[in-house]
Amino acid sequence: MVVNSSKDPQNKGMTPRKEIDQEMVSWAKKNLKNTPGNENYEKMVSGVPYNPYDPDLMFRALATSEKVREFNTIASESRTFESNHAAYIKKVEILKDTFGQTKDIVWLTAPFSVDFGFNISVGEHFYANFNVCFLDSAPIIFGDEVIVGPNTTFVTATHPISPEKRARRIVYALPIKVGNNVWIGANVTVLPGVTIGDGSTIAAGAVVREDVPPRTVVGGVPARILKHIPEEDPDEAEGEELEFLLPVEMNVNTANQKV
């Protein structure tokens, strides 16, 4: 899916759309669960100014905050593998109930925070470390095999730079898309409308405000391309590959077999 970031080529900033993005609305209805079915939601995911204080949105945000609070406070009842695994499974159930779309294997290290949850889509083997924040007024779409470092923030909601327009409480949101096999380092901020290409790496501390090409390393404030990543011949790769499982993938039989 190609995400329309609604970027202004003149100032490399963001501008709100004036019309509903039917492609995005159709994608959201088809792929995301528990989304509002009203016009305000269609504006929100389209980059059109919307009402963030819509009663339905506020109710859903409150319900999501309760789920996230439960996730962040679940603890193992005892120091046994079975008890730990039960806690992992419960957390994954909460994640799958909170996010709009998930694959089988998804894991976040508590705590994390999110606005709504229903606008988040994560691929297979998604992992995020401590204190990741998802401001998902517009969709945040992750591919497979994505790793997110601690204290990283994904921001889709934004405001006009004009103080007069901000005084009128104008707010709109632009989607973020992260491709497959992407590593996002610690303390990164990804801004509205950004697409991060497959196989790329975002260096720690970067502020990403423009699209990232596939197989590149970007870093800095604002982020810029530091290097291009050449394709590697699997037969010539150096070092021994270490195979391991995420906690939710493990069971009693695999616990002592995998590192």
UniProtKB/Swiss-Prot annotation:
CDD domains: LbH_MAT_GAT (cd03357)
Entries under SMART domains matching the protein: Mac
Binding-site positions, acetyl-CoA: N129, A186, A204, R209, E210, R224, K227
Keyword Repeat recorded: yes
Name the record gives this protein: Sophorolipid acetyltransferase
Marked site (Transition state stabilizer) residue numbers: N129
Top-level taxonomic group: Eukaryota
InterPro entries: Hexapep (IPR001451), Hexapep_transf_CS (IPR018357), Hexapeptide_acetyltransf (IPR051159), Mac_dom (IPR024688), Trimer_LpxA-like_sf (IPR011004)
Induction: Induced in early stationary phase (at protein level).
Residue ranges, annotated region (Disordered): 1-20
Gene3D superfamilies, per the entry: Hexapeptide repeat proteins (2.160.10.10)
Function according to Swiss-Prot or TrEMBL: Catalyzes the optional acetylation of acidic sophorolipids (SLs) at the 6' and/or 6'' carbon atom of the sophorose head group to produce acetylated acidic SLs in sophorolipid biosynthesis. Has no activity toward lactonic sophorolipids, confirmimg that acetylation must precede lactonization.
This protein's record includes keyword Disulfide bond: no
EC code(s) of this entry: 2.3.1.-
Reported consequences of knocking out the gene: Produces purely unacetylated sophorolipids. Yields mainly lactonic SLs, in addition to minor amounts of acidic SLs.
Gene encoding the protein: at
Similarity remark: Belongs to the transferase hexapeptide repeat family.
